[in-house]
Amino acid sequence: MSRVLTLLVASCLLIAGCLEGDEDIFYGDDINPPVAVEDFILVDENGDYFSFSELEGKVIVVAFLFTRCPDICPVVSANMNYVSQELGDLYGTEVAMLSITVDPWRDNSTIMHSYAEQRGLDWPHLTTASEDLSDFTDLSDV
């Protein structure tokens, strides 16, 4: 009797596991049409100029952070790293990541390089002169 009960329970679990579940639920905001951003030049973590036009045609995920941020910025960076890995082949070909400091007075390219390297982040970490950043944030509606 217990053998039949075990087989029945196992069959029910197996069948339940094979049934189709709910579709994935999207919790974000669908931005359609995409927001156009004017071309802008910043400085990357290697001290080289970086132009947004280099990423033309790609979806760009942008995080505004600062390296001395003790709480949410490292979490945002870790989440972006996770997303970049989950994207697989789409990452780099169709989707790009950028991190832009909101503290260019302290976050120069050397500090941005160190921040990215310590966390194993492989996308551009950008900085600029403070007056240029305010121009960019105005254009980006930040």
Question: Where in the sequence are the language-model features?
Answer:
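Thiol-based oxidoreductase modules, predominantly thioredoxin-like and allied folds used
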Residues: 92-107, 122-133
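Short active-site neighborhood of thiol/selenol oxidoreductases, capturing the structured segment around
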Residues: 50-74, 79-80, 98
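Sec/Tat-exported extracytoplasmic proteins
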Residues: 59, 66, 84-91, 119, ...
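N-terminal "domain-start" segment that seeds a small globular fold
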Residues: 22-53, 78
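Secretory targeting signatures
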Residues: 1-23
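Solvent-exposed, polar/charged alpha-helical surfaces in well-ordered, non-transmembrane soluble domains
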Residues: 67, 74, 78-85, 110-117, ...
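Short, internal strand/loop/helix patches
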Residues: 113-142
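Envelope-exposed proteins and targeting segments
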Residues: 36-38, 60, 96-98, 140
